[in-house]
Amino acid sequence: MDTHCPYCALQCGMTLTPTAGPLPVTVAPRDFPTNRGGLCQKGWTSATVLRAADRLTTPLLRAADGELRPATWDDALDAVAAGIERVQAEHGRDAVAVFGGGGLTNEKAYALGKFARTVLRTANIDYNGRFCMASAAAGANRAFGADRGLPFPLADLAGADAVLLLGSNLAETMPPSVQHLAGVRSRGGLVVVDPRRSATAALTGEPGDAVGQRVPDAGRSPRRPVPAPGAGPVGDQGVHLQPVPGTDLVVLLALLHVVVAEGLADAAYLAERTTGVEDVRRPVAAWWPERAETVCGVPAERLRHVARLLAAASPVHGGAGAYVLTGRGVEQSSQGTATVTAAINLALALGLPGRAGSGYGAVTGQGNGQGGREHGQKADQLPGYRKIDDPAARAHVAAVWGVDPATIPGPGKPAVELLRSLGARGTGTTFADDGRPRALLVHGSNVVVSAPDADRVTANLRALDLLVVCDLVPSETALLADVVLPVTQWAEEEGTMTSLEGRVIRRRRAVDAPGEVRSELWILAELARRLGSPVAFPTDPAVVFDELARASAGGVADYSGLSHGRLDADEAAGGPGLHWPVPAADHPGAPRLFLDRFATPDGRARLVPVDHVGPSDDVRPDAPLYLVTGRVLQHYQSGAQTRRVPELDRVVPEPFVELHPVLGLRLGVGDGDRARLTTRRGTIEAVARWTDAVRPDTVFMPFHWSGEGSVNRVTTDAADPVSGMPEFKVCAVDVRRAPALQEVPG
């Protein structure tokens, strides 16, 4: 059975073969455009999750003694329906909220948004994609009028002379994608911007800028790092820029300054295909490389070198092409949208977007991070990437759903605000008085581990009148629930996903789900029936997709020319899948967007002026170091799946904190010691690992674990004012050696 990996947005092709062994299927890679026969460790071991030792196989209800106990589906769903009716009767429709996930199929994401807006009629629905792609989406929509992570096939990168990769560690998070960088590396054109010398940064063949930087004294006033003298080395395969955390925007402003000041911009392209260039000149003029160096720590000559390298690769200067790509490292910031906008401004100045062989793109992370934000589980959207406050969009979708447009709620709270507002803590007696949702339905998300300021989120979840979680395993969030509903996962279900390239692909069922596991489509249909909704909720994924296609017709993300049958036929004929928009059954799809015009009313891309503000929680005397969070190769997102795979868990079984050896000596934190990290949100502990891959003013922790080493317990929930994305990637921290047990008084 040909299908796709359950993890990241590469959606690597794989073949599943049923087996009588301990696992229900064997996994083999297949030749697909994104992975070309490769799989990472997570993909190779993905069958193990199908038979996780603690796989949920029956509904669970919280009993009077406080324990979760097995229940029948009727009892569990009756409890959910009764709880919803009670909360809405007492506190209003918006007192019930829904939280979705970027791993849900397109069909599930669509049905979840439809359920929230037609059955619950609540405005309060959002999803964990707000933690992943919101800033990139906001920037792309503002500039291009459309948001498709990569508006070109990933394979196009191979022909470029330069790729600027900001805040993405592809070599660990998406290993099969690295093969697409082989060509640009051979030409010395890979530029990686990352405060760490990550596995991806190491592909450039150079150490970065961190050598020689000043190490802050614990308890003293912080100082900006001093860059290494001179331009520093340039690797044989590219350049690694290692800025101060939270200053990626300064790097981009300086690069654009050089492009403008040295006459390297594509003037004809700017005149013919863009607007706003004059508005951008003023803020960019203030960021000459020497000034930028004092803030971002990257030597001025290296900034000039990279700007000239990108310009030389651009078509206007006779190059084979260049790409500017952003990832979570620069987007998960209180100025994430501004940083993405600066990256787009740079790409537009060089004449890259809308040209074959060049462009701007965002590296989508979650498996259906693209499709998951297109069809209705986002707080401000309707299917087809329509705006929920657009009267024409509301009328179109309402006709498909068979409801009055006036009954569709307006925009709801974005994820951080929604999670911050949960629980019966207000002083008023109605939802209108205190504004706090009292019930939450969670699908495909583990917010206890993945949300910022997670201790506060956990406390808010505990304060709910009703928490319902649909999950595969007893995740940390599921363990807090009043009702837990076991659901199907990737190899047990039919559906579609949309990859980081906007390629719509089929997910196929290879095995039956164990026990009493059900699909979310069935669960939503049963709840709609119990709640007395006249709106139809089909349970056949192919039928749901056909409805999604009708609802998306005419939207930015138009799937109306697609069906399960067409996707199956395309694959059977050796096709690679179809990229949206696909507005008709005979439309070939659009692998490359914007070649003729951008999706704005006048067809021109917008350059938007932005400027650097800095992190919301910057270093200070009592927290003189930067804390940066990220991922490791062996784990995925909150770790709820990968921590249950022995082959992966054995390699990285616990959280750790990386720090520079010089910093470790200064702080008295040895390699292998337990380190204590304290921010304004709280304190955590983890094993210290010395490495010169991090800056001496920075510590790094992956976020895949719960408990005392769960780094999101101490990250800030400050959010980007445009996108609502939280600032996971930088906050101020104090680091000390944790006292050994025998050292604790008493």
Where are these regions (language model features)?
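Long, contiguous, secondary-structure-rich segments that constitute the structural scaffold
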Residues: 514-516, 520-572, 638, 643-658, ...
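Short beta-alpha connecting loops at secondary-structure transitions
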Residues: 236-243, 488, 492, 502-514, ...
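N-terminal leader/propeptide and maturation segments of large enzyme subunits in energy/redox metabolism
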Residues: 67, 257, 262-300, 383-399, ...
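N-terminal export/assembly segments and adjacent metallocofactor-ligating motifs
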Residues: 1-262, 299, 404, 443, ...
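Flexible glycine/proline-enriched surface loops and loop-helix/loop-strand junctions
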Residues: 163, 234-237, 287-291, 325-330, ...
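Flexible, glycine/charged-enriched surface loops at secondary-structure junctions
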Residues: 92-95, 265-270, 317-323, 354-363, ...
